[in-house]
Amino acid sequence: MAVFLVLVAATTSRGETGGASVPAPAPATAVKAQLGERQLAEGSEGPDVRTLQSILEARDYGPLEVNGSFDAATAAAVRRFQREAGLQADGVVGPQTRPALLALMRVKKATWYGPGLYGNRMACGGRLRRSTLGVAHRTLPCGTQVTFYHGGRFVTVPVIDRGPFRRGVEWDLTAATARALGMAATSRLRAIH
C-alpha cells in the first residue's frame, strides 16, 4: 500500500541552526480538513486555506500571509498559478486546480522516531517527549515550519532535530507527528518546500 504525504516548508527569518539564536519552535498543529474537500475562493477561511497559502508561498506565488483567510492576495496568487499551469485563471481552487497544485510536489521517503529516545535532547533545543510534534531534517533551519498531509489529515510542525541518518530518507517525524498522520511505517511522501 503506497502512502503519500504532502509537505510544505517555509523557512523562518531567524533560521540559525545552532548557538543561542535558535528560534523557539512555533506551535505544532494537527488539522483534519483536507485541501480539496470544498471549493476555495475569496472569503473562504480555515485550515485548508492555510495549507493552500503554504503551498503557494513555498513555490513563490506570494508574498502571502499564511493565516487561513482567502483574501485578495491569495486569489491573485491562485490566478498566477493557474495561468502558469494553463488553467482558467479564475482565482478559485476547485477540481481542476487542486490536482495541478498536487503535481508540484516531489516524492520523498519518511521515517519516524521516538520510543527509546524520549528524554534525549534535540538538536534545536528541548527534550524529546512522547507528545512532541516535530520533524528532523539534515539541513533545514531549526524552527522551519513544515506541513505534512496523509490520509485526509494535515499536520504543521517545526524542524526540531537533525536527521534522518539513514541513506535515502529525507524526513524523520517524531512518533507523535506520525501518529497524528496515521503513519505506521516508513513511507514515501510527497514534498514541497
Sequence positions of predicted segments:
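N-terminal export and membrane-targeting signals
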Residues: M1-A2, E16
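Intrinsically disordered, low-complexity, compositionally biased regions/tails
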Residues: G19-P23, G36, L40-A41, P47, ...
